[in-house]
Regions:
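Well-ordered, non-membrane alpha-helical segments in soluble/globular domains
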Residues: 84-92, 172-178, 211
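VWA/integrin I-like adhesion module and closely mimicked acidic/polar interface patches used
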Residues: 45, 202-211
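Acidic, polar low-complexity linker/tail segments
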Residues: 13-84, 96
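DG-centered beta-turn motif at the end of beta-strands
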Residues: 74-75, 179, 192-206
Length: 211
């Protein structure tokens, strides 16, 4: 004879175990979801906490940069195709070797350097899509900003300078001295400074000439 009471008790026991297992799994799932939300929240909070104030015109941190590269291109001379290609490659290395929030300023040698000594372009690298935080930024938009706000403005200036006809006077020594003061004087003490000069370094000014 089948013990129906025993069968009934066994079935109820199984149902209870299934119920307990479901409750455990549900609890673990809730804990896992809460853990993910907490982790994401931590990333977002940390990113917002460490976010720097950025100047919209230059893309540079308002409290200063850690590295400032100044490029001086001598337009008093004409460059042949081979020279242009070499200079373009060097400029590309400088630009693409510039890290996020580091600054590049471009100057040219001119006869009227003492009247106005402003960079033709001065931009900080806003960072490309490779360093995007997916919780805070859009990868495609970040890449477009990097190209439109950093790469294209600099390339446009470089092209204009290298394609220009020679301007005659080349006060290169005065320009190097003036730029060393004008470009770097407002930087933080801790800012690394570097000056790149593209010139034949032949002085040709009203004061002195090596021709």
């Amino acid at each position: 004879m089948i013990n129906r009471k025993h069968q009934k008790g066994t079935m109820e026991s199984r149902r209870n175990r299934r119920k307990q297992n479901k409750e455990k799994k549900g609890g673990l799932l809730i804990f896992f979801i809460i853990g993910i939300i907490g982790t994401i929240g931590g990333f977002v909070f940390n990113a917002m906490l460490n976010k720097q104030d950025i100047d919209e015109a230059t893309n540079c941190p308002t409290d200063g940069v850690n590295y400032h590269k100044v490029i001086l291109i001598d337009t008093s001379q004409s460059y042949n195709p081979i020279q242009k290609e070499w200079i373009k490659n060097q400029l590309k290395k400088i630009v693409y070797g510039t890290k996020e929030n580091e600054k590049i300023s471009v100057y040219t040698v001119g006869a009227n350097y003492h009247e106005t000594l402003l960079p033709l372009q001065s931009k900080c690298n806003p960072g490309d899509a490779s360093g995007v935080n997916p919780f805070l930024e859009n990868k495609r938009m970040k890449q477009e900003d990097w190209e439109n706000e950093f790469i294209k403005p600099l390339n446009s200036v470089f092209k204009g300078l290298l394609d220009n006809d020679s301007e005659g006077l080349s006060p290169i020594m005065e320009m190097v001295q003036a730029i060393s003061i004008a470009a770097f004087q407002n930087e933080k003490t801790s800012t690394k400074r570097e000056l790149f000069i593209f010139s034949d370094m032949i002085q040709n000014s009203e004061v002195a000439s090596h021709y």
